[in-house]
Amino acid sequence: DGAKIVGVKGKIGGARSEEPSLSFSSPLTISAGGYNCPVSRTITEIHNEPHRDDEHFCGGYREYWENVEGLGDPEGPIEIHFIDEVLPGYFWLFPVKEGVVNVGIGMLISEQRKQKGMKKSLKQIQRWVIEEHPRFKTRFANATLVPASQKGWQLPFGSPRKNAPSYQPRRVAMAGAMAVGDAASLVDPFSGEGIGNAL
């Protein structure tokens, strides 16, 4: 409604669905639909501001593994590794529960697009680290991948924008609407962690 968001409209099953459109009105609409939430996009579009800047988005890929060696306490510290083959990103191991670890890799999307060969694919880089890197191949020698645990996604960083127009970081609220979580770009650009910031 011009300078104010008054609700949402959409279809169950997405825009191409045969279902009829539904509309919901509210004095405050919460944008909680992830990094590409339509409400967040509308907030920036209304103000003629960029919604996305690849300098402030990270590509992430993770898998769950069982029986990775050298983890110590199942609720122990996370591991973040800056490996030459992964730069300008990092490789992580985060304990999830006893015997299970979240293993992943992340890289700025703007940098990932500049890579060549294996480094173009986070999944391929991760496979190489697990199978070939001298520091990790022995740790994963007897480990098993948890079936259907592979997932890739994009993380919107809450970092200051350098290019004009400069919004610190991205507009996340306006009359009638407010963004939360990934829709509000709350991911820490150093650690890739966003839950604490979102809370």
Where are these regions (language model features)?
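Predominantly flavin-linked oxidoreductase catalytic cores and closely associated redox partners
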Residues: D1-N142
